[in-house]
Design a protein with these regions (language model features):
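Hydrophobic faces of well-ordered beta-strands that scaffold small-molecule active sites
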Residues: 7-14, 34-38, 60-66, 91-92, ...
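N-terminal capping/lid subdomain adjacent to the active-site entrance of alpha/beta enzymes
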Residues: 1-77, 81-85, 202-228
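Shared catalytic-loop signature of beta/alpha-barrel
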Residues: 81, 87, 98-114, 119-219, ...
Length: 228
C-alpha cells in the first residue's frame, strides 16, 4: 500500500574538511534540503557542525555518521555533549555494538541525541529493540527485508530511514523512491542519492524539491532512460 505521494531525501557528504562541509551545507540549504547526512570523524566533527550551522542556519538538521570511528562510548558521549546544542538529528553507528548492545543503551540514557544502528539483519534489529539500544534504524536490502525490518521498527514505535540504493543512478533511484513510498514509518530523509550524479541517466526526472522527491505515477518505475 502506498503511504506517501512524496518522500523525504537528505543532502549527503563524504569525509571532508570542516570548511568543505560548511560549503556543502550552504549549497544544500539553498537547494531546499532540510537534513544533511555527513561522514563524520572525531577530530573535526565539532568544528564541522559549528561551521555548517553558521552556513546553513540553525534549522538545518545534521545526521552524524561516523562509521564507528568515534571508537567507544566515552568518546561518543563526550562529542555528543559538545554537539547537543546544535540541530543534531541522529548519531548513526558511532561505535561498534558487538558483542552486545549494553553500551548503546547506556549512550541513550546519557544523551538526548537519537541513536541509530545501521542494520539489515532482522534478528539484529529485534535484539536492538529488546535491549532498548536504538531510537530509529537505518535499514534496507531487498524489498522483503526492508518491509520486515521497517515493520518491526514500527511495531516498536520507531521511525526508519532507508538505504535501499545509496549512490546509484536514476533507475535505481526511482526504485528506491517507490520502496520508500510504501513504508509508513520511513519518515527520516533517505539515502537515495542519484541526484548527486553529474548525469543520472533519467534526465533529472526525480530532482528533489524542498527536500522531497515526488513518487512517479507513470507505469513501471515511472521514469524513462535518457538515451542521449
Amino acid at each position: 500500500t502506498k503511504h506517501w505521494d512524496k518522500v523525504p531525501v537528505g543532502y549527503w557528504s563524504p569525509p571532508l574538511e570542516a570548511e568543505e562541509f560548511a560549503a556543502m551545507a550552504e549549497e544544500g540549504a539553498k537547494q531546499g534540503y532540510k537534513t544533511h547526512k555527513l561522514k563524520a570523524r572525531p577530530w573535526n566533527i565539532v568544528e564541522t557542525v559549528e561551521l555548517m550551522t553558521k552556513a546553513a542556519g540553525p534549522d538545518y538538521g545534521i545526521i552524524v555518521d561516523p562509521n564507528f570511528t568515534f571508537g567507544d562510548l566515552h568518546t561518543s558521549l563526550k562529542l555528543a555533549r559538545q554537539l547537543v546544542k546544535y540541530n543534531i538529528q541522529a548519531f548513526d553507528d558511532p561505535f561498534q555494538y558487538l558483542p552486545g548492545w549494553h553500551q548503546y543503551r547506556d549512550f541513550r540514557r546519557q544523551t538526548p541525541i537519537p541513536l541509530v544502528p545501521h542494520l539489515y539483519d532482522s534478528k539484529a534489529i529485534m535484539s536492538a529493540i529488546r535491549a532498548e539500544a536504538a531510537d530509529m534504524f537505518n535499514t534496507g536490502g531487498s524489498v522483503e527485508t526492508t518491509l520486515i525490518n521497517a515493520g518491526m521498527a514500527e511495531a516498536a514505535g520507531m521511525p526508519v530511514w532507508l538505504q535501499v540504493v545509496g549512490l546509484g543512478l536514476g533507475v535505481s533511484g526511482a526504485y528506491g523512491t517507490h520502496v520508500h513510498a510504501v513504508v509508513r514509518n520511513a519518515t527520516i530523509p533517505s539515502d537515495v542519492l542519484h541526484f548527486t550524479r553529474e548525469n543520472d541517466l533519467i534526465g533529472g526526472a526525480l530532482l528533489p524539491r524542498d527536500g522531497f522527491v515526488e513518487v512517479p505515477e507513470a507505469p513501471g518505475l515511472g521514469v524513462e532512460l535518457d538515451m542521449e
